[in-house]
Amino acid sequence: MGNSPSYNPPAGISPSDWLNLLQSAQRLNPRPSPSDFTDLKNYIHWFHKTQKKPWTFTSGGPTSCPPGRFGRVPLVLATLNEVLSNEGGAPGASAPEEQPPPYDPPAILPIISEGNRNRHRAWALRELQDIKKEIENKAPGSQVWIQTLRLAILQADPTPADLEQLCQYIASPVDQTAHMTSLTAAIAAAEAANTLQGFNPKTGTLTQQSAQPNAGDLRSQYQNLWLQAGKNLPTRPSAPWSTIVQGPAESSVEFVNRLQISLADNLPDGVPKEPIIDSLSYANANRECQQILQGRGPVAAVGQKLQACAQWAPKNKQPALLVHTPGPKMPGPRQPAPKRPPPGPCYRCLKEGHWARDCPTKATGPPPGPCPICKDPSHWKRDCPTLKSKNKLIEGGLSAPQTITPITDSLSEAELECLLSIPLARSRPSVAVYLSGPWLQPSQNQALMLVDTGAENTVLPQNWLVRDYPRIPAAVLGAGGVSRNRYNWLQGPLTLALKPEGPFITIPKILVDTSDKWQILGRDVPSRLQASISIPEEVRPPVVGVLDTPPSHIGLEHLPPPPEVPQFPLN
């Protein structure tokens, strides 16, 4: 952090005494340099080595430092002695060595005079990382936590925006909310009591005025209020639920149940618990469950993780033995051998949890040669477009799989006999259809629709429906290419029948033509009716004629002789 010292105390001094020495060093004039902090640390090492005891305020006065050996360390000790003498005590003194724990923690020396303020500069990422590293093992809101942040603030003179950035980097979302609430109340109380020096209510709030370049004392007062708001943070473990780890023989359900109980007891109301459970159910799981979940990844839902790990049984759990009388041994059904997990990571993707034959990246690489069907070197034979059907409706793009709609309507045998054949005319294959549904116009209860066996779904024109029908854009592949802006999906059900008396079938998904051109009966209707399409043969009357003059050539005599081409010998 530039000229900033290390807030972690060296060997031979307590954290409170080390913070007091650092605050005293900040009062040096001129300002302390990195060499001053190095001399201070070397002095503590020398004192602990020579005196055979830790440094305290009572044992390490200004006379304990040899002159001329540790630079300006005697001035630091004299400043500390002067401040503590004015305070009338030694709040930073450590507990005696012979006093056993527990004992009250020592108080931290408050800053009386900050001396010459440093110029403002924005936080660097390295500084934020160092500050977070120094306070990560300290309880939020404790005296050591507050004074460590105070020393960091003295180095950069941060604005309110910089302090907000620091709070977002070092504090949890729960602590950020509590700190902001306390800070807002403290600023409002200070502005109402008119105790702020240099504050003018007509020019804006304290936050706005302290952000100005020439704020001076106003910024210092805002920083003190920001630090005081940190004292109201609850001193609790940062995340007690993070220490819950799944045991070697513990089931996933019991492990997730313990996580939920810990979150319910320690997490405040209103804070979402699902992201924490999703993360820890994978990160703190045992080795066997992590190998099973490796293919799903840490972003899978908790329910999917529990289902995946439910089939795994711990090795040290033996099945219960049933006491039975001896008798003849009867052969039972042969049980399939259990699938053993792979011994190591997949050699294709270097991930654990699956064999190389089941690797999802198996077919993502380039083929070794061109396709044997179309000679295209960019795809495998199984992905050749010439093997796929061209004239079909596909949702979501050209590579989406074809969906097969199951038959959910139960039809009687008499109804099936009536619907086994749909007669169509050869000139125009249309059929009369009786429609009903919540999104259909009342006048469109009967219509003539074109039967298209190349269409996977039924298509209705948009003017048959009401204006506010639920729609989802669809990409459709037809004979003219891909249409992405013309068709919509209607998710509402549509009841359809080929006869007024029924039977009626329900189609859950229909394509809507926004151009009002097509009314097509797709393959989904015959598949649900289990019907076939029959087109009668067109019978033409025979043509009888009389030849006036017989032709001069009958057969192939009038054609020219074929060219003589030498053939490849068969032998």
Curated annotation (Swiss-Prot):
Against Pfam families, the record matches this protein to:
Gag_p19, Gag_p24, Gag_p24_C, RVP, zf-CCHC
Site (Cleavage) location in chain: 109-110, 323-324, 420-421, 545-546
What PANTHER family would the database entry show? ENDOGENOUS RETROVIRUS GROUP K MEMBER 24 GAG POLYPROTEIN-RELATED, IGE-BINDING PROTEIN
One of its GO biological process terms is: viral budding via host ESCRT complex
**EC number(s) per entry:** 3.4.23.-
What stretch of residues is annotated with the motif PPXY motif? 100-103
Which GO molecular function, any one, fits this protein according to its record? structural constituent of virion
Name of protein: Gag-Pro polyprotein
